[in-house]
């Protein structure tokens, strides 16, 4: 494996770790406060449940994106570069949306750093090498 590929995998792993940390903070630290605030608000009760669900789904979304990026980066597949870049793009869109609707805060700073790590890691990934022909003699 090339040094470039090793660096790419490290960057993708770091980006995924940031997404895991973001999901943990979002789901474990922020959700209880949001849930309490929703209960105390005058928001229609029919909207409180869906908002709680969406809040938790966002954390799950980051976990799923991180897992897909890790699997793609550490598996020799033809699509790994595209998959990691797509994961980075997905987080970039979420970062832009949080900036537009909420403004600058720790959450979108974490998402932004995960985006950069995933995108740079994805760009550095080599395309998967072709599997060696089973009939060809080995070079050992």
Please describe what each predicted stretch is.
Residues 2-8, 39-46, 76:
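Helix-boundary and loop/linker segments of multi-pass membrane transporters
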């Amino acid at each position: 494996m090339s040094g470039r590929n090793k660096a790419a995998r490290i960057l993708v792993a770091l980006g995924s770790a940031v997404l895991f940390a973001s999901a943990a903070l979002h789901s474990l630290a922020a959700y209880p406060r949001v849930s309490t605030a929703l209960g105390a608000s005058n928001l229609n009760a029919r909207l409180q449940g869906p908002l709680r669900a969406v809040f938790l789904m966002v954390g799950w979304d980051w976990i799923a994106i991180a897992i897909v990026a890790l699997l793609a980066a550490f598996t020799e597949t033809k699509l790994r570069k595209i998959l990691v870049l797509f994961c980075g793009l997905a987080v970039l869109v979420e970062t832009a949306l949080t900036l537009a609707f909420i403004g600058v805060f720790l959450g979108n700073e974490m998402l932004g750093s995960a985006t950069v790590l995933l995108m740079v890691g994805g760009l550095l990934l080599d395309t998967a090498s072709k599997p060696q022909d089973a009939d060809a003699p080995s070079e050992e």
